[in-house]
Curated annotation (Swiss-Prot):
The keyword Transcription applies. The keyword Transcription applies. This is HTH-type transcriptional regulator BetI. Pathway: Amine and polyamine biosynthesis; betaine biosynthesis via choline pathway [regulation]. It comes from Pseudomonas savastanoi pv. phaseolicola (strain 1448A / Race 6). Keywords: DNA-binding, Repressor, Transcription, Transcription regulation. Repressor involved in the biosynthesis of the osmoprotectant glycine betaine. It represses transcription of the choline transporter BetT and the genes of BetAB involved in the synthesis of glycine betaine. One of its GO terms (molecular function) is transcription cis-regulatory region binding. Residues 8-68 form the HTH tetR-type domain. It comes from the Bacteria. NCBIfam families: betaine_BetI, PRK00767.1. One of its GO terms (biological process) is glycine betaine biosynthetic process from choline. Residues 31-50 bind DNA. The gene is betI. Signal peptide: none annotated.
Amino acid sequence: MPKVGMQPIRRQQLIQATLTAVDQVGMGDASIALIARLAGVSNGIISHYFQDKNGLIAATMRHLMNALIQNVRERRQALTEDSPRAHLQVIIEGNFDASQVSGPAMKTWLAFWATSMHHPSLHRLQRINDHRLYSNLCCQFRRTLPLEQARSAARGLAALIDGLWLRGALSGDAFDTEQAQRIAYEYMDFQLAKSAS
């Protein structure tokens, strides 16, 4: 009989083991057996909690997405001003937070993006994540720009964030958070300056 209260602990163990496995060998070779071994549990535990590898991958991605949401939320709560610029900055900072740019997180995101093209449930998660970023950016740009300009600025900044993140992930070097933020801030400021003209 399983111990009461073990489910959240086991689930977290398996998610961390998945991040480690993908970091070490990639998504394709991150087998149920390897993930279970890294977590120190039997293979059957994965089936018990997640049904299969895709269920575990989806849970791992929800974990990364929730970390992103939480990081942005905490930064928003710490804001001392309510300007669109301040809110856009925390969205940028959250997307380049250490929880999103560590080696295991970056490799898992990359593998997830590739896998999501072939698995409807993972594709749905990807679309939710994309829409959340775009709508949060658009909401802030809309506070100072006309609707079409706000939409365009949001699409551009979302693409820039993803592009900077992707180039950083593929570089093989440590992610340069300061540089990525600086470039994103420059684009943000360029777009916000349009409201004054």
